[in-house]
Amino acid sequence: MPAYRSRTTTHGRNMAGARGLWRATGMKDSDFGKPIIAVVNSFTQFVPGHVHLKDLGQLVAREIEAAGGVAKEFNTIAVDDGIAMGHDGMLYSLPSRELIADSVEYMVNAHCADAMVCISNCDKITPGMLMASLRLNIPTVFVSGGPMEAGKVIMHGKKVALDLVDAMVAAADDKISDEDVAVIERSACPTCGSCSGMFTANSMNCLTEALGLSLPGNGSTLATHSDRKELFLEAGRRVVALAKRYYEQDDVTALPRTIASKGAFENAMALDIAMGGSTNTVLHILAAAHEGEIDFTMDDIDRLSRRVPCLSKVAPAKADVHMEDVHRAGGIMAILGELNRAGLLNADLPTVHAPTLGEALAQWDIAVTDNKAALELFSAAPGGVPTQVAFSQSARWEELDLDREKGVIRDAQHPFSKDGGLAVLKGNLALDGCIVKTAGVDESILKFSGPAKVFESQDSAVKGILSNQVVAGDVVVIRYEGPKGGPGMQEMLYPTSYLKSKGLGKACALITDGRFSGGTSGLSIGHASPEAANGGTIGLVREGDMIDIDIPNRTISLRVDEAELAARREAQNAKGWFPAEKRKRNVTTALKAYAAFATSADRGAVRDLGGK
């Protein structure tokens, strides 16, 4: 029987000093021997997805203590990718993932916590905490802050739903007036919560459901809705039960590595492909698998992408559909249910809330259940009132979306496409693979060939696009923006948004060793591995080289013969793998430290410390 980790600091004569300090935090004699649960919050006033979390940690803490545990809260950092976008702030986004994972490990191990509730929400916070949970392997429940309501506005007599990306695209479109841009800007992000489309934050929060580490509704219940409060309360109760199961009954099914097994990672990736999630999820899923010592690679993702159809399209892939619409259709449990009926799910795996995922689906998939709690949960609707307050409204949809032929969520017999929403491409331009969000690619450009327009940084690409250097038919290549070369693997949302604003969204392709925001759509291919800074072929591309992209056949090729490539490689080895033009970029000591250990995207951009 495993002993409570916290006994190290709460029992024995030699721990009198530690107990004295615990007493100074409010603990009493009766608390020593109870499980100490870390409440890992990520409140910050910088990020709309986290601005409402300030009091929610204590909400969970009170429930933990009512259930027989001792709750101790601490905070991690949280970077807003949208605010950090388009300038050197984006260099810090991906590295913050490792800092978050490390900070959780530091706090939990330093104080010998027995279990934890992770209160996350936005882009790097959920992945960082997920990595920490698998690294630590103590009972853990995830509960996120929830998605933002979609913006809604009447423009030129028509009601439209908006999100962050609409504001970015409109601002760069000369055909849209300053007045209309101002209306879009003021309406795009109306409430607290993670941005309203299937961007990285919401994608990752949905994947925690598929991994079995969060409760039904975690990925789709709006931040503003009163129903979301119950998820936080239940997380507090559930984590104490998990802790007691493991430490008092030696039940390893309460542990993250048992729950989030390889089969669960396959489920998460199948969900990601079916819902057309952000390409960033690939990076984070690979990193989390690495932390859990799970053999899950790009080859597994490629295998799944060839089997799983696209069952849902959400903004940015479908501009008029947002997370609130996915929720009305049954949320993630509904998509998982359709995958299960198609034989594409491992349903016999444990979760934090049910003995098996299959049993959970029987209760929470609205296509098959008469469970009143499920039907009530998925009727939670947007309130339509701008606010930064959690649980502040209780609006209900009059009816649920149960249309599996033409609705927001489709069954496997009526998919948006038989090909899934994500694909791994390989070829001489990306020997270790690259990723494209096929759900956001127009069918007319699934096969594309064009001359390379090469840029040595995102900044120069933005200038080139806005100054009309890029024309229809070009393949924009942005290199030296990988984990090591950036450093930090910036998101390329501005270049893709500006291509759209120039009317080139369906007329150009973009390839990079950097990554893309979850808000990106179009023929945008990221994570080219190896990256340029690691000697990848993307560093050998020259202006005008022809590039061939074939998504149906999963290939990406530079039309240059092997002898010429070998000559270019020899010359580049002599010069060093650095950008051809000097960049105005302040690479600090912190960023240099990250770059020194960062691996390419095909390994999740995790750190290679030369050991495991």
Curated annotation (Swiss-Prot):
Homodimer. Its EC number is 4.2.1.9. Signal peptide: none annotated. GO terms for molecular function: 2 iron, 2 sulfur cluster binding; dihydroxy-acid dehydratase activity; magnesium ion binding. Binds 1 [2Fe-2S] cluster per subunit. This cluster acts as a Lewis acid cofactor. The keyword Signal does not apply. This is Dihydroxy-acid dehydratase. InterPro entries: Dihydro-acid_dehy_C (IPR042096), DihydroxyA_deHydtase (IPR004404), DiOHA_6PGluconate_deHydtase_CS (IPR020558), ILV_EDD_C (IPR056740), ILV_EDD_N (IPR000581), IlvD/EDD_N (IPR037237). The keyword Cell inner membrane does not apply. It catalyses: (2R)-2,3-dihydroxy-3-methylbutanoate = 3-methyl-2-oxobutanoate + H2O; (2R,3R)-2,3-dihydroxy-3-methylpentanoate = (S)-3-methyl-2-oxopentanoate + H2O. Its cofactor is [2Fe-2S] cluster; Mg(2+). It comes from Rhizobium rhizogenes (strain K84 / ATCC BAA-868). Belongs to the IlvD/Edd family. Functions in the biosynthesis of branched-chain amino acids. Catalyzes the dehydration of (2R,3R)-2,3-dihydroxy-3-methylpentanoate (2,3-dihydroxy-3-methylvalerate) into 2-oxo-3-methylpentanoate (2-oxo-3-methylvalerate) and of (2R)-2,3-dihydroxy-3-methylbutanoate (2,3-dihydroxyisovalerate) into 2-oxo-3-methylbutanoate (2-oxoisovalerate), the penultimate precursor to L-isoleucine and L-valine, respectively.
